[in-house]
Amino acid sequence: MMDRKKTLAAIARHVTDADIVLPVYSSAFDWLDIRPNPLNYLSHGAMGLASSHALGLALGRPDRRVIVLDGDGSLLMNLGTLVSTAEAAPKNLFHFVC
């Protein structure tokens, strides 16, 4: 089984202060402990929409990397966004399920 904190720590080693990171739910609390940053975008209260928020941010801010740390349930609630993301194909969007 994957250890979420170890996974997030591995991702954090590749994140810069200029990156926008969208952690969701359980991952959010761990992420804020591992890598606090003013550009962490918490989307609590919008379960299933982290991928949509990330796509909008990636398209609106092509000058920044956008990293979404999604949950499996959250992603399953909005699978259609994967089609939109694939069609838009932003080079600055990185989507992890952890």
Q: What are these language model-derived features?
A:
Residues M1-M47:
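Active-site diphosphate/adenylate-binding microenvironment
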Residues L32-V97:
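Thiamine diphosphate
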